[in-house]
Swiss-Prot record:
Species in which this protein is naturally found: Azorhizobium caulinodans (strain ATCC 43989 / DSM 5975 / JCM 20966 / LMG 6465 / NBRC 14845 / NCIMB 13405 / ORS 571)
Gene3D superfamilies to which the protein is assigned, alphabetical: 2.30.30.790
Alphabetic keyword roster: Ribonucleoprotein, Ribosomal protein
GO BP terms, alphabetized: translation
Record carries keyword Lyase: no
Protein name: Large ribosomal subunit protein bL19
NCBIfam families per record: rplS_bact
Alphabetical list of SUPFAM superfamilies matching this protein: Translation proteins SH3-like domain
GO molecular function, a single term: structural constituent of ribosome
Family, per entry: Belongs to the bacterial ribosomal protein bL19 family.
Length: 131
C-alpha cells in the first residue's frame, strides 16, 4: 500500500466515524439530507430520488440521484464524503441489472419504474436469528 492509499484509508476511516453511510446501489431510492447555506443560516433540505450511478472510489466516490420535479427530470451529483451531506437514508431497494441507469433519462411514466428488490435470504436470516 503506497502512502496516498494509506492516507485516503485513514481519512475515510475518520470520516465514517462521524457519519454512517448505508450500503446502496444504483436503482435504490434514497433520501439525501443536504445542508443548504442561506445567508447566515443553514438548513437541511431533503432530496429524494433514484440513485442512477456510482462513480469513483475511496474519498472521491460520487453518486448521482435523479428525481422528477414538476414534470422535469433533475439530477444531482453528491460526493459520498461531502461535509454538506447530513445523512443518507435508503427508502427502497431497486432490482436492476445495470451499474449505470442512464437509460432512465429517456423514459417517462410506467417505463421509468424500477421493480422492488426483495431479499428473501436476508428475511430468512433475520427470522432464524430472532428465534
Amino acid at each position: 500500500m503506497n502512502i496516498i492509499q494509506q492516507l485516503e484509508a485513514e481519512q475515510a476511516a475518520r470520516l465514517s466515524e462521524t457519519k454512517t453511510i448505508p450500503e446502496f446501489q444504483p436503482g435504490d431510492t434514497v433520501i439525501v439530507n443536504v445542508k443548504v447555506v442561506e445567508g447566515e443560516r443553514t438548513r437541511v433540505q431533503a432530496y429524494e430520488g433514484v440513485c442512477i450511478a456510482r462513480n469513483g472510489g475511496g474519498l472521491n466516490e460520487n453518486f448521482v440521484v435523479r428525481k422528477i420535479s414538476y414534470g422535469e427530470g433533475v439530477e444531482r451529483v453528491f460526493p459520498i464524503y461531502s461535509p454538506l451531506i447530513d445523512s443518507i437514508k435508503v427508502v427502497r431497494r431497486g432490482k436492476v441489472r445495470r451499474a449505470k441507469l442512464y437509460y432512465l433519462r429517456d423514459r417517462r411514466g410506467k417505463s421509468a419504474r424500477i421493480a422492488e428488490r426483495t431479499d428473501d435470504r436476508a428475511k430468512k436470516a433475520k427470522a432464524t436469528a430472532a428465534e
